[in-house]
Amino acid sequence: PIMAGFAEVDSGRVGYRHRAPTLGEHQASFDGEPFPVPAARSEPADLPLAGLRVIDFGHGGVGVECGRMLAEYGADVVKVESWSYPDFIRIVLGGVMTASFASSSRSKRGFGADLKHPDGREVVLDLVRGADIVIENNSTGTMDALGLGYRHLREVRPELIMVSSQLMGSRGEFSGWTGYGPTLQTVGGLSWLWAFDDGDPPPGSPAIHPDHLAGRVCAVFALAGLLGRNRGGGGNHTEVAQVEALLGTLGDVLLKEGLEPGSVRPRGNDSPRGAPWGVFECAGEEEW
């Protein structure tokens, strides 16, 4: 078994369209002459996404990461929050303006509105009328409950590109699960792979993977949606389930287990790249 893609666009799975290359099939591309490097410009060029307007309803990791990437490539990203439901990255370290928030939302503009009040909703809809992209990674059903789901937003902006990301997707028996990267590592199988093959529970990890991965997948599909729109395809809605972004990175593991059941085991400090692989005590005092 292999993953059938990382996302759905307008409820259609976007998967692989071509076979995998054979060994050495594209070797000539690597052995050929390198592409010439253009001479440096005397004046700095505009950033590639300059002129695009993005409305960012992101919280925590995925949506916030996607918006930051688009902003740093020149898009005008407006981050929408409310005092009732601020981006939890603001407060996770015990303050309204923390280093983690300043880092994750750099290059953006901030905007506050009460999305549950009719006036606040109308103000946000006015923003959307002039937007190219909307990003959100709220719990399943939140945007629809606020009257700001894709079906609502496309009424005021038919050419809108919207990207949504939920932990387990927006449909199915697990769609109501809420959480972020660390809560997904267990159900996605990553914690088990990181464990030692000794029967003890997985040790856990402070890494917020796959939040940043899923955020980058969202950014790629946002740009793909823009390309499709510019070619006459109109607006579209992409959904990226975080769990599928994680499983997509484990494709080789899933394929191996499918071909050789029972062959995949927790890796601990083992690595297919070399042996020994780990942290070892060396001669001397506190030398490793």
Task: Kindly label every feature range from the protein language model.
Residues 1-17:
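A glycine-rich dinucleotide-binding beta-alpha-beta segment and adjacent secondary-structure elements
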Residues 4, 97-99, 179, 274-277:
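Short beta-strand-initiation
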Residues 9-13, 130-136, 282-285:
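Short, surface-exposed connector motifs at secondary-structure boundaries
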Residues 18, 260-288:
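Alpha-helical interface/anchor segments and their boundary "cap" residues
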Residues 18, 22-237, 257, 261-266:
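N-terminal helix-loop segment corresponding to the beta1-alpha1 unit
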Residues 84, 167-169, 242-247, 284-286:
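Glycine-rich beta-alpha junction loops
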Residues 232-248:
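Polar, surface-exposed loop/tail segments
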